[in-house]
């Protein structure tokens, strides 16, 4: 039942407008930004400048905001394959308000009605075949024939969900022994715009406890934290001491007493007044910053904006919030490991599509307003009038910022991050679900240390889909299939917070005012109450109960009871939280089991939202923080094995293992039956598999798109099915035999049947973009030149449609002309071809030509080519059994079974044992069983569910296959049945027609073709360009590059004894040959000056030198020079050896032996 409930979550839920679960939270986030948040951001009414003691003000107001999105939602747009973008217009009014005796006089300085539909253009979620979603490209030939696809630079191509830098928990850091810091961020709520950010730091040095300060750069005073708390809460030191010591470990109480005592040096000074003391610090900070505002405004900004996330709270509540932070700080010093560290996902929120654009829109709006303010200021300073340039008004930077985002750059200050390349359909789902980190958060040093699977990532992140190499090796980033990211609109946020506070205030006032010895309650870190310790468990249980029955009209609230001496109840309702469902355990009993029979009857007819509504206590949505601070059993089977007493310790139970995998890992089969590395390698190879795109390939001008004939996998998981990966396909079923074949399939080599290839097996179509930029004067040049490269061009200078391009053919005309400075030449103008050529090794047909005319002519050509498997192409199974075609055999060369069937592919059987991929055998057994019984007892086609990770025993699958054969072929005897179940066949040798002595494992398998194609990588050249430094062939086939001759290549030739070949490759060419003179005294290379060769070292010492001329490679000289530059001296020594000569070989009589025994005479 737990598996069925997990599957229900993955399925579409139309009642909640969930049509595609993998990307649903992304669509909701994007729609919230366009439909709601953008208007909130743009609704500005702000004073820019004020004069004459605020009697004259310059006020900016943005109104008449019109957002024109499509009539349908982004979710429906994605399903129907329609484009989704939005146009935004607004009006900017700049007015001058003057307070006179007669009242307020308002005059308009400037007003701009933004009727231009391009003022803000929200990029496409899904778009047509334009390269840039912000500009309309023009198709020259031919016109668009229709068809929609996910655009190259549309929103769904934004690669990863970035982790926010700011943390929701304070960060504890050990600066040095006995010195610590506790830094935290305070961000204003979503309804406060513009957003205010404040970052504070509490420092503590155990040797100088009187300097336990809280500070913030230029936004707050530096003050003793105890003094500030006393100032805010207006209580004595005993009250503060009782709060800090209540329920704390004994070892921390000594430190608390010392901190309180050290603060008395300030508080018990003569004639001390705490209000005057704080006021003096404010004045001192005012003088230090040299603020241009008045002292009253400075004081108000400093104190009112202290802790912006509690902007509407009283000073007392802010003080108690600081007191709670100080309590955590002290506890951290002694129990660091029990506090969420900075790598914990408990501390972080995740940016989704909508949040990307929300942050960018906020930043660009502030830049826009700042530019207007600066223009008015300069105009007033220089001309004495308040005017603003129309150019400043009409050029907001939204479109430029959005375009930068789609190019992989989030902000100007942030480094670029990887946008995903759309190699396969799976990456539409997998990459936008992954969570990435800023470049400075992933240190290169982590390459050399083992990355641990952080406890906070358990169940929410996929442990299998991790990079296997590079600086991000082992970085857990893919969300599990059940995980999503929370979204909430501003109005919903305010209503939900008010509803929660209303519920909290239903408790007796005395029970929620235990600020001295109670547990504080925070909503998004905003302290709202402190509850009686005796009521904590009752409050949390009742809150969870009300949450599940949708009392607050939101099922994604997170509530965490943080015990362990920190005494806090944290309620989280904001966006960016990782959430997923869990099974509820109540008083030691799994609620699912109490209504199991009723659920079993209805499970096929209800949706996930129906379960939440009609059976609210079966499943609860937990955010990651609530999960960490709850007791969760890892599976239902483990929970049922526990004793009754142990069961009562748990709050929740997790779903089966398959739901902890990501969508890429879910395409694999039985990874828990294989060795660990196979899961990691399998995920990497699944991303490289060639799939069938769901969009019109002919209109998609993009790099390296391949199309495979669609064939749905028979053995799959529910996540693969509901995510549409199975329908879009990423492989084909082939008949595989596990055996050795004449030594051809050693190691990774595989043998493929020629007739299988000729019939279209694993055949693909490659659609490739070829793009060139040509100066417009070269493109329009009418000069004629004789070049065979232009044979495929049309009269307009572009390559013809349906032309077959060969290596060396030009894609577009590019003729450069020059004038010779020679008066004796009649025709002193020469023209020559500088066009870029088609460089692929294979011919391909021109499918589309697109031209964009700007300052240059940008030509994009889409070519199509059918590509059959050839020697060197790579393939893999879903268990990471990667292989390379080593031999293509005809059918007559291959072994056959009793029915004359020959295998399509032969794989080395030892690979199963060496790589420990037992699940590959199970997949073949199940696929073979499906082939004999593809329909269930109701006559419906039923794919076989074999999840990526499962707790099912292998014998269960064997028994399932056995029943399939017994049902389909009931007259099989026991031995024949076992042979069929285990796919064991007697094969016959094609040369002798005799059976092999051993049965061969042969059966159907879903096989994947990878993007690593021989013709894309093979490089052939005799001579060409070389790099200046090492004088080896440069890289890149487009640049006429070749393969570098390195150490391994050299060692191969040495092993073959090909000394002359090595000499020819490394030394004999003019560029590589290098004569050097070496001093036999010191081993230095001699210096050549004015045609004289001498050793610098020995000459300075007046020593006689003997220079010996040697010939070596240029690379050797470069190596010696680099070593010398690093202070490492290398001596070249000479050993005298006598010359070696090969002795004469023995003469061998090669005449036939029959002639030796007969006299020919």
Curated annotation (Swiss-Prot):
Enzyme Commission identifier(s): 2.7.7.6
Swiss-Prot/TrEMBL GO biological process terms: DNA-templated transcription
InterPro entries xref list: DNA-dir_RNA_pol_su2, DNA-dir_RNAP_su2_dom, DNA-dir_RNAP_su2_hyb_sf, RNA_pol_132_poxvirus, RNA_pol_bsu_CS, RNA_pol_Rpb2_3, RNA_pol_Rpb2_5, RNA_pol_Rpb2_7
Disulphide-bridged cysteine pairs: none
Pfam families named among the record's database cross-references: RNA_pol_Rpb2_3, RNA_pol_Rpb2_5, RNA_pol_Rpb2_6, RNA_pol_Rpb2_7, rpo132
Major localization listed first in the record, in broad terms: virion
Catalytic activity: RNA(n) + a ribonucleoside 5'-triphosphate = RNA(n+1) + diphosphate
Keywords: DNA-directed RNA polymerase, Metal-binding, Nucleotidyltransferase, Transcription, Transferase, Virion
Location(s), subcellular: Virion
GO cellular component: DNA-directed RNA polymerase complex; virion component
A GO term for molecular function: DNA-directed RNA polymerase activity
Top-level taxon of origin: Viruses
Subunit structure: The DNA-dependent RNA polymerase used for intermediate and late genes expression consists of eight subunits (147) kDa, (133) kDa, (35) kDa, (30) kDa, (22) kDa, (19) kDa, (18) kDa and (7) kDa totalling more than 500 kDa in mass. The same holoenzyme, with the addition of the transcription-specificity factor RAP94, is used for early gene expression.
Function comment: Part of the DNA-dependent RNA polymerase which catalyzes the transcription of viral DNA into RNA using the four ribonucleoside triphosphates as substrates. Responsible for the transcription of early, intermediate and late genes. DNA-dependent RNA polymerase associates with the early transcription factor (ETF), itself composed of D6 and A7, thereby allowing the early genes transcription. Late transcription, and probably also intermediate transcription, require newly synthesized RNA polymerase.
UniProt family annotation: Belongs to the RNA polymerase beta chain family.
Official protein name in the record: DNA-directed RNA polymerase 132 kDa polypeptide
Organism: Fowlpox virus (strain NVSL)
């Amino acid at each position: 039942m737990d598996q069925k409930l997990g599957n229900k979550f993955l399925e579409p839920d139309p009642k909640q407008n969930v049509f595609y679960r993998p990307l649903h939270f992304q669509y909701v986030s994007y729609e919230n930004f366009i439909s709601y948040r953008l208007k909130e951001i743009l609704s500005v009414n702000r004073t820019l400048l004020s004069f004459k003691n605020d009697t004259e003000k310059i006020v900016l107001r943005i109104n008449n905001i019109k957002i024109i999105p499509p009539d349908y939602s982004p979710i429906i747009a994605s399903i129907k394959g329609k484009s989704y973008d939005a146009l935004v217009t607004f009006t900017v009014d700049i007015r001058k308000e003057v307070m006179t005796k007669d009242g307020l006089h308002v005059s308009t300085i400037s007003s701009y009605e933004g009727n231009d539909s391009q003022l803000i253009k929200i990029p496409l979620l899904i778009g047509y075949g334009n390269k840039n979603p912000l500009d309309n490209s023009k198709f020259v030939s031919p016109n668009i024939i229709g068809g929609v696809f996910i655009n190259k630079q549309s929103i769904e191509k934004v690669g990863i969900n970035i982790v926010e830098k700011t943390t929701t928990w304070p960060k504890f850091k050990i600066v040095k022994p006995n010195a610590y810091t506790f830094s935290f961020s305070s961000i204003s709520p979503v309804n406060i715009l513009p957003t205010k950010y404040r970052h504070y730091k509490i420092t503590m040095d155990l040797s100088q406890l009187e300097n336990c300060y809280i500070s913030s750069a230029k936004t707050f005073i530096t003050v003793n934290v105890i003094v500030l708390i006393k100032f805010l809460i207006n209580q004595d030191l005993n009250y503060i001491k009782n709060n800090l010591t209540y329920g704390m470990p004994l070892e921390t109480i000594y430190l608390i007493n010392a901190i309180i005592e050290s603060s008395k040096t300030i508080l018990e000074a003569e004639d001390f007044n705490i209000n005057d003391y704080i006021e003096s610090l404010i004045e001192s900070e005012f003088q230090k910053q040299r603020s241009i505002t008045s002292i009253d405004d400075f004081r108000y900004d400093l104190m009112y904006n202290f802790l912006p996330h509690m902007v509407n709270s009283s000073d007392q509540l802010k003080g108690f919030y600081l007191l709670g932070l100080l309590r955590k700080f002290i506890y951290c010093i002694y129990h660091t490991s029990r506090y969420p560290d900075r790598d914990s996902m408990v501390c972080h929120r995740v940016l989704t599509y909508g949040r990307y654009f929300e942050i960018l829109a906020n930043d660009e709006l502030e830049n826009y307003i700042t530019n207007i303010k600066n223009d008015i200021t300069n105009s007033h300073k220089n001309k004495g009038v308040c005017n603003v340039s129309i150019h400043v008004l009409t050029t907001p930077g939204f479109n430029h910022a959005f375009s930068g985002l789609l190019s992989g750059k989030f902000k100007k200050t942030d480094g670029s991050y990887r946008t995903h390349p759309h190699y396969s359909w799976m990456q539409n789902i997998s990459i936008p679900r992954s969570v990435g980190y800023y470049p400075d958060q992933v240190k290169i040093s982590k390459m050399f240390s083992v990355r641990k699977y952080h406890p906070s990532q358990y169940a929410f992140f996929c442990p299998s889909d991790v990079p296997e190499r590079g600086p991000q090796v082992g970085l857990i980033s893919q969300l599990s299939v059940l995980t999503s990211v929370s979204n909430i609109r501003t109005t919903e946020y305010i209503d939900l917070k008010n509803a929660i506070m209303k519920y909290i205030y239903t408790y007796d006032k005395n029970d929620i005012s235990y600020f001295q010895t109670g547990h504080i309650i925070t909503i998004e870190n905003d302290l709202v109450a402190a509850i009686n310790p005796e009521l904590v468990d009752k409050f949390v249980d009742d809150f969870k109960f009300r949450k599940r029955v949708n009392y607050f009209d939101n099922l994604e609230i997170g509530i965490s009871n943080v015990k362990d001496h920190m005494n806090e109840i944290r309620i989280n309702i904001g966006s960016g939280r990782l959430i997923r469902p869990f099974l509820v355990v109540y008083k030691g009993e799994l609620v699912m089991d109490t209504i199991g029979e009723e659920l079993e009857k209805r499970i096929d007819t209800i949706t996930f939202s129906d379960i939440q509504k009609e059976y609210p206590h079966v499943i609860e949505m937990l955010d990651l923080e609530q999960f960490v601070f709850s007791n969760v059993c890892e599976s239902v089977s483990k929970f049922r094995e526990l004793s009754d007493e142990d069961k009562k310790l748990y709050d929740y139970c997790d779903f089966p293992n398959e739901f902890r995998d990501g969508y890429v890992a879910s395409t694999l089969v039985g990874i828990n039956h294989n060795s660990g590395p196979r899961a990691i390698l399998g995920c990497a190879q699944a991303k490289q598999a060639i799939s069938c795109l769901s969009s019109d390939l002919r209109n998609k001008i993009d790099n390296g798109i391949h199309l495979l004939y669609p064939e749905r996998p028979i053995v799959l998981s529910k996540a693969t099915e509901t995510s549409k990966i199975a329908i879009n396909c990423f492989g084909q079923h082939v008949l595989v035999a596990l055996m050795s074949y004449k030594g051809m399939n050693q190691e990774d080599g595989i043998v493929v049947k020629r007739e299988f290839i000729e019939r279209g097996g694993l055949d693909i179509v490659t659609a490739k973009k070829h793009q060139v930029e040509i100066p417009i004067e070269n493109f329009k040049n009418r000069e004629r030149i004789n070049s065979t490269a232009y044979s495929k061009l049309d009269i307009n200078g572009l390559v013809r449609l349906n032309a077959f391009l060969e290596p060396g053919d030009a894609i577009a005309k590019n003729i450069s002309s020059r004038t010779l400075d020679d008066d004796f030449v009649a025709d002193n103008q020469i023209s020559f071809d500088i066009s870029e050529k088609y460089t692929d090794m294979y011919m391909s047909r021109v499918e589309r030509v697109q031209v964009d005319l700007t300052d240059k002519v940008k030509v994009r050509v889409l070519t199509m080519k059918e590509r059959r498997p050839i020697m060197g192409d790579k393939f893999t199974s879903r268990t990471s059994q990667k292989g390379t075609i080593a031999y293509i055999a005809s059918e007559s060369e291959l072994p056959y079974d009793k029915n004359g069937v020959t295998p399509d592919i032969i794989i080395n059987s030892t690979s199963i044992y060496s790589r420990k991929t037992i699940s590959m055998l199970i997949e073949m057994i199940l696929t073979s069983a499906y082939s004999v019984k593809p329909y269930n007892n109701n006559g419906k086609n039923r794919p076989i569910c074999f999840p990526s990770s499962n707790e099912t025993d292998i014998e269960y699958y064997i028994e399932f296959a056995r029943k399939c054969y017994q049902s389909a072929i009931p007259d099989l005897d026991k031995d024949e049945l076992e042979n069929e179940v285990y796919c064991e066949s007697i094969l016959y040798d094609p040369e002798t027609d005799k059976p092999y002595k051993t049965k061969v494992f042969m059966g159907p398998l879903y096989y994947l073709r990878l993007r690593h194609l021989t013709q894309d990588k093979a490089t052939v050249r005799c001579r060409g360009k070389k790099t200046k430094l090492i004088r080896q062939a440069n890289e890149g086939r487009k640049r006429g590059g070749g393969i570098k001759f390195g150490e391994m290549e050299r060692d191969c030739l040495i092993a073959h004894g090909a000394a002359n070949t090595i000499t020819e490759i490394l030394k004999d060419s003019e560029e590589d040959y290098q004569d050097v003179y070496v001093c036999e005294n010191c081993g230095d290379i001699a210096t050549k000056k004015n045609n004289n060769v001498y050793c610098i070292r020995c000459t300075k010492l007046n020593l006689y030198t003997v220079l010996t001329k040697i010939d070596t490679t240029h690379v050797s000289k470069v190596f010696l020079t680099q070593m010398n530059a690093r202070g490492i001296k290398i001596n070249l020594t000479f050993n005298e050896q006598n010359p070696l000569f090969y002795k004469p070989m023995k003469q061998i009589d090669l005449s036939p032996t029959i002639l030796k025994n007969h006299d020919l005479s």
